[in-house]
């Protein structure tokens, strides 16, 4: 078991009822996390009898997992605002309130995206000065990973929102991923400054003026897989389309490679020889190893995983929360916003 010398415990509230494979995969993800690290306590939120039945399958340090009863579940098809307002005993609302009341350092869920986005703003609340909280997943590239921000939270963003996304994304990549002076680019249809729609044209000069980020200009969609930027800024509609295309294409390519390798006896022999290198390459492009997408700019950490998240993504999302807390990402975002506000007032 990995030991933390300071033994400062990170408490992660985990939605045991959210996602396509709940409660089995969230529970297994929690167990794997606490079996790997002693500096984590997972608060499993859900229908207690169901959660405990899953826990009975595993051996784990009992003091590191606590079951919090939540009778209700918010389904994906439910209108998010109504669900958050009416289902006070749902796993999502209970988890969000634990973060708000400082009973947990973070909340992780594979549940309803809409409910998580609404709950994050309504219950946890925004850091003072943050106009909109963006959803920011990591996507694999040939050079490592890039942060795609925003990917689903703000489909009607303004230029000032995108500037804040760039700053928050830069802080996240530098402190969580350890990338010094991360390259920030705005997603565009060409490299020239005059290219793009009205939002991009308005945002570009504002980003150029920012002295606290390393703005490198525009990035085209075809350049994303090559890792030409560490932080890719866009509004949520475009970001979500890029993310879903990225994920779908990755799955298609893996399937095509497997099919081709098994098509003939010669290809099967070649596949056996190439298998170690192929596994290593495919692992590098497996987004689940990086955890979920944080909703940045809130008064507490909220992480949204894929609805289809298996245990490994849940576990890595929990580890992600530990790093977020240790690096005081919210404190750094708050400090940056205060500094920016003071400069604007000069």
Where are these regions (language model features)?
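N-terminal phosphate-binding or glycine-rich loops at protein starts, especially the Walker A/P-loop
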Residues: 2-52
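Short, glycine-rich nucleotide/cofactor-binding loops
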Residues: 12-24, 153-163, 304-311
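Short beta-strand segments
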Residues: 15, 44-46, 68, 109-111, ...
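Short glycine/serine/threonine-rich phosphate/pyrophosphate-binding segments
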Residues: 22-26, 89-102, 106-120, 127, ...
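Glycine-rich phosphate/diphosphate-binding loop of Rossmann-like nucleotide-binding domains
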Residues: 24-25, 37, 41-43, 48-52, ...
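Glycine-rich phosphate/nucleotide-binding loop
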Residues: 121-134, 138-148, 228-232, 236-346
